[in-house]
Amino acid sequence: MENANVHPKAKIGKNVVISPYVTIGEHVEIGDNCWIGPCAAINDFVKIGNNCKIFNGAVIGGLPQDLKFKGEESYVEIGNNVMIREFCTVSRGTAASGKNKTIIGDDSFLMAYVHVAHDCCIGKHCILVSYVGLAGETDVDDWAIIGGSSAVHQFTHIGTHAMVAGGSFLSKDVPPYAIVGDRPVTFSGINVVGLRRRGFTMEQIDRMRDVYRIIYMNGLNVSDACRAAEAELPDSPEKRIILDFIENSKRGIVRYNPLKSTQE
């Protein structure tokens, strides 16, 4: 910890490497076997799990960039086995949101220069490629991947196992298992390669396709399409996850452009 500025009341686990010029605040808890790179800042009210790596110049627990923030105590919580690369910024939560906490789940990977704003919730096994920017209160479900230089509007929800193409601007929710991209962002198919890598069977993937054919390709509005999928398709976990996501969407889901689609 030579040349590092670590508050004596910070709780540091076993086998933690703290590089030169790191700053760690008073109300910080870092789990075992972590590595904190040079010039990183871990500010107050941050809890970091075990086996995490935080690289050079990252700032974890910065004050929210939100005018509703009034200096209240709020938090960042990072799970186990998380990697946060150079110059990422992760802001604390806000009381105004009702969440008061920014969360990054286990086994997630934030590449260089990613920004995670106040009250975002990133699930487990997520990948955010370099220069991704998440606005406040964005939810990213488990196993989602967001391509580099993508910008995500506040309150947006990205579903489980979804993949967002690099350079996207998202202002609508991305339903589970989908690939989206282009400008404006549109649905372009199922994330088949990613799903097969994670052990999904073709039978499961076909059930996803069946749902999305009705949602996007029957000429119905989304509400009517969901009712049709509910009535016409047999029950399955995949159907339930997709329809529940759409039913609970607050911003509406991304549109479909048949000229851009890879859906079969």
List PLM regions with ranges.
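Terminal amphipathic alpha-helical/low-complexity segments used for targeting or macromolecular assembly
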Residues: M1-N3, P8-K9, K14-N15, N51, ...
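Structural signal for interior beta-strand "rungs" in well-ordered beta-sheet cores
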Residues: M1-G181, V185-T186
